[in-house]
């Protein structure tokens, strides 16, 4: 069976003057389509480097990365830009919203670069912000801003949603709301969702868990009994 995502012996080395930093070494893992995968590890483990390579925002030093059967590790600049634009949605810890645009306008920006027609207002309603769509980011809570960020990512109808510490700046209750939405997105749409976190408690919600430490993939686990977010405590 072909996996949707395959990392094959991926290494990444950064050079700073005469110093070489090995951010990743011989990383191997797979993710199937429609899974919610949690990549977990301490700060500096290499999680974000993995995410950046998977999202086409960084290149690898050696190895191969396949997404949907295509080797993205050797794409040219134009093809890699198209991959990021059309196939991947991004959600970050800090929401990166444009402050002088309303919530609706922030989401509409994503629809303008998508090759799939979507209704920004409808997507905001799906994440529970129908009555906040005319508000500016400064008028929204942190959780609401993150919901706008997720709506913006979903507006592109990506095959792959990448989330880097999506609850890191949020309180416990709001963080659970965000994680519930991400879990529901994978379950209901068949979208592949990847969450980067240092919080090992979140592994219970995942279909697949990739443990990263010191730039290596220590182990990968499948979880046939993923828990609903509401049943997880930390």
What do the predicted segments below correspond to?
Residues 216-234:
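Conserved beta-strand-loop-alpha-helix hinge in the C-terminal portion
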Residues 3-212:
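ABC family nucleotide-binding domain
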